[in-house]
Structure formats: C-alpha cells, structure tokens
Amino acid sequence: PYDSEWKDRVRTRIRRSDGVIALISKNSLSSTGQKWEINCANEENVPLRGIWAYKNDRTELEGVSAFVWTWDNIKAFIDSV
C-alpha cells in the first residue's frame, strides 16, 4: 500500500538519524507503515527505542524494546546515540 517514493523518503530520513523512537500502542499491531519503518531502522542498524504511548497499553512488538513514556527514558535513549 506504500509506494516506493514514500519508502525511499522514509529510508533516507532513517539513515540520516542517530536513532528512531517508535510510539507503541495496540494499533501498532495492525499498522503496516509503522512496522515497515521499524524494520527499516533495524535493517539500517539505526538504534531503535520503543516508547509505550499509553500507560494502560503495554503492547509488545517483535524486534522492539519498549519502555514507559518518561522524559528520563527518552533522555537516556537520546544520550545513548
């Protein structure tokens, strides 16, 4: 459903990034675009951090280590890249 131009633009942005933060929720399980972006970050060896978008939703996605949304968790990831 995503054209090659979109994928090329996203891949270029991911390659230029020091890291990628993915907001994870139950909707992530059916989001083909988000799954593609996560796989792309992994393929490009760009550090990836999952952040759960909601306090009552702890959806797990394969290939993503997810953490609670706190500024300390986000800061720790940014400081690590």
What are these regions (language model features)?
Residues 54-81:
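C-terminal interaction surface of TIR/SEFIR-family domains
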Residues 24, 52:
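Short beta-strand/turn micro-motifs composed of small residues
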Residues 1-10:
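Conserved BB-loop
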Residues 14-15:
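A short, aliphatic-rich alpha-helical micro-motif
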Residues 18:
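Conserved acidic residues
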Residues 43-51:
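A short helix->loop->beta-strand "cap" motif at the edges of active sites that frequently abuts
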Residues 26-44:
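Conserved TIR/SEFIR loop-to-helix hotspot centered on a Trp-containing motif
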